[in-house]
Amino acid sequence: MAIILPELPYAYDALEPQFDAETMTLHHDKHHATYVANTDAALEKHPEIGENLEELLADVPKIPEDIRQALINNGGGHLNHALFWELLSPEKQDVTPDVAQAIDDAFGSFDAFKEQFTAAATGRFGSGWAWLVVNKEGQLEITSTANQDTPISEGKKPILALDVWEHAYYLNYRNVRPNYIKAFFEIINWKKVSALYQAAK
C-alpha cells in the first residue's frame, strides 16, 4: 500500500473567483503531490510503523528518528491539504446551527471568531496554517502552526484549516494575505466543519 493523492472534490475552477484554477492546479497537482511522494518515500524505510499518519503524528516521539522530520513535514503536509480541500465549497454555505452556537459560546460572536481567526492567519510569520480546533477539553480554540505542523501533534482535533503558505495565494493575491483570508470565508464548507465538530466532541 501507499499514501495516495486524493482527487479534488470539485473542478479546478470551481472555487473561482476566490481561488483561481491555476493556483488550485499547482497547489494540488504539484505541491500536494510532492508531499505524498515524500511521505511514501519515508514510510518505505520503516514498513513496521504502518501508514496511519494521524496516529503517527499524534505521537511524534515514536516515529523513527531518521524519518521523523520528513513525516512531520510531508505527512503533515498531506494530512493538512487533504483536509483543506474538503473544507472548501463551490456553493456558498451558511454556518450550521451547531457550529454557530459553539462559536458563539467560545468567542462571543461569529464576528469575533472571524476577527481572531483572521488575526491568527495574518500573524503567522512565514509559512504555516491557521486552525479552528477542538482542544483536549472539548472546547473550540483558534491556533496556528508553522510549516506543515499539524494540531494533531498537540492532541487537538482540527475542524477548520487555512493554508497561509504563499503558494496557496500568491498568483492571485500577490503579497496581500488578508484579501486571500477574506476570500476563504466566502467558500467554507460549513457542513464539513459541522461533521468534523460532531466527530471531535
From Swiss-Prot:
Alphabetized InterPro entries for the sequence: Mn/Fe_SOD, Mn/Fe_SOD_BS, Mn/Fe_SOD_C, Mn/Fe_SOD_N, Mn/Fe_SOD_N_sf, SOD_C_sf
Molecular-function GO term, any one: metal ion binding
Top-level division of the source organism's lineage: Bacteria
Keywords: Manganese, Metal-binding, Oxidoreductase, Secreted
Gene Ontology CC terms: cytoplasm; extracellular region
Cellular compartment(s): Secreted
Cofactor(s) annotated in UniProt: Mn(2+)
Quaternary organization: Homodimer.
Protein purpose: Destroys superoxide anion radicals which are normally produced within the cells and which are toxic to biological systems.
Protein name (database record): Superoxide dismutase [Mn]
